[in-house]
Amino acid sequence: MQYLAILLPLLLSVVLATYIIPRILVVSVKKDLVVPSETRDKGRLRVPRLGGVSLFPILVISVGATMVCLVKFHILPLIAYEDSDTFVYYMFGIAGLTMMYLLGVMDDLLGVSLTSRLVIEVLAAALIPLSGLWLDDLHGILGIFEVPWWFGIPMTIFTIIYISNAITMLDDVDGLAAGTAMIAFAVLGFLALYVQEYLLLMICATMIGMLIPFFYRNVMERRIGWRNIYLGGTGGLVIGYVLSFVVIALSRMGGTSLPEGIIMVCFGTLIIPMFDVLRVAVTRMVNHRNIFQRDNNHIHHRLIQGGMSPMQVLATILVVSVFFILFNAVGVWGGWNLSILLVTDVSFWLILQVVISYYKNKNRDL
């Protein structure tokens, strides 16, 4: 019966998203809430950007309704209230997610200055470590084990902001943000099921369920231009914040309910966006440019510049993402040194960048 914690929120979120998305499309087109896209197919350069406004309400409804049903019929214990610390984690998490959601909506509709955006993101991210949920142990990565609060809390805040914005950067290619997030939530959901963290499991199942219709519309029906829709800044911030919360929660279980190095698997689900944002930021600094100024230097842009179609880019990035996840899982369960595992991840990433640069330059010279 525990699998109802997967099926109920998954099915409910699929139904809700399938119902809501077409109505968001209609409003976006009527109100001209669309943005140009250079990476999506020619002939479909203006795409509705408000898809992400549906995510937070669907998450709350699906998880809330599932909890009520499972607890009411005594299928699962009253998860959120068994442990006062757990209750605080989730309440602070909901508050922070609400702030991120409102920030995304304001940014998509009106635009928000960089300073205001950063202040709100810091406040929202700070709520998670203030609840007591923060990265207090790196389990030997680079020789670091227990982390003092004065370092761990700022590191956690930075990580949440980092992941939230990294996911947002993937929304230029049809299905890329949704596909990457679904893979990550599937892996994290499996880990949550393994340790019987049913509320985390419901969250992961709900996120997968609501992203399935987005992925279907943007990939399976990609030739029908008006049906495609951006997740937008709202979607990226919501997905990134939820991913951050789940990743941090599961990473803290390393050495107890999960293997010591599970932090590498959790963060390994997000290697592509995290490594890519770091590479882009370093490149901008080396070139004496503003690191917050958007450009066409992200991995999906580079693959397209190398001659790939958007669908080939999508398939390539998702396959590479799965490779990194499997590689880290094998390393963790095989008892590998986490520092060596991290260095190997970075080495694979650098080799990938060299290959992409080769084909990009080759295509430019044609």
Describe the role of every protein-language-model region.
Residues 1-277:
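"…together with the soluble PPM/PP2C metallo-phosphatase catalytic core" -> "…together
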Residues 6, 251-366:
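C-terminal membrane-associated helical module and adjoining short loops/tails
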